[in-house]
Amino acid sequence: SHNTRLMISIWANFGPWTPQYKELEKIGALYPFETWPMKRGVKPYDVFNPKARDIYWKYLTALYKMGVDSWWTDSSEPDHFSKEGDNDYMTYDGTWLGVKNAFPLMHNKGIYEHQRAMKGNDKRSMQMTRCGAFGLQHYGTFSWSGDISSSWDEMEHQVPSGLNYVICGTPYWNTDIGGFFGGEYGNDPKNPAMQELQVRWMQWGCFMPLMRNHCSSPMLDELYEWGKPGDWAFDVQKKFIELRYRLLPYIYSNAGDVVLNSEIGRASCRE
């Protein structure tokens, strides 16, 4: 009733206590790589193996039927701590060295194709991945700039990062507004310098193709953490969040141009 949609975070790695791990292990579709979280025996799955992609989706089916609208495919590089010999490992499609840059593409492709194949499905597939490559847009997938720190330098770097990304053919991109990790001002919402950085980032974020606030504790995510009505940092952020909602007809029209007229990157990252 409030036009709220649900996106959940799903990873490409599994721990040995999970049913996914056990099923993937039976078909030899787990990489012997160390990944996050460390020292827990967690392994990425072989996204190049179509049977492995089938298994991955099988465990998402119930969530999809419950009404999950989109997928946050985090750790899609995968989050891999490289060691000697990893590059020579043979995946389903060849050596890890030869195919690893296509890992996020195949991971997201598997999710997209399985969702679209669901009986009676009329929902568009939407995925946000931390890492990507040419062709992601074909599978309803976009990226953000990853887990960045909270600083003016980092915010400045996001501008060319976004422009370079969309010019590669994937028009939707975003950044963690305010930064993901703590930076030069800590995480004190009463610090005027931190307020200034957060507010300016929120103002800029209002005009990105996708607007998204995201951080890691103890950084601050919620508007109410920045004060109350009448406080500068609260009021300005609220104003631009509301402006974003008023811009939705324009944003939706832009999205139509991207799809129907192939105007790559026309979404507000370039306008």
Task: Enumerate the predicted regions with their spans.
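Catalytic-domain carbohydrate-binding cleft regions of carbohydrate-active enzymes
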Residues: 1-270
